[in-house]
């Protein structure tokens, strides 16, 4: 098996603050507690620089270097991550949750993290057809490319 050399007992879970990722996080925590496994919550984020402004017919020239995110932007993402964890776990979870904030596309970040895991858990928004093709599917990419088993969790339906 491709994942046999990975650290024993590591579960990676993708987190983005959505109800689906909250459900995945709770499921992964329960599974980690059952397996006595290490739980790594991964939040992938991308920096999108603001578009330079120019008058019609002019070439836009950025006023500053947008090659990376500022500390304030990173701090805002870290706060979103912590809020998502607090929302998923109103009380202390049964396992320690290692937090990992990684800059990059979620699908590829989770694929890379899967190389060091025995199990990856992701949420699914349930998109299919054209919506999935146009918007992409992180869960599908991870299922197709991870070298270890992947569990896809849907958020419970209200009602």
Name these PLM-found stretches.
Residues 90-98:
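A short helix-to-beta-strand connector/capping loop
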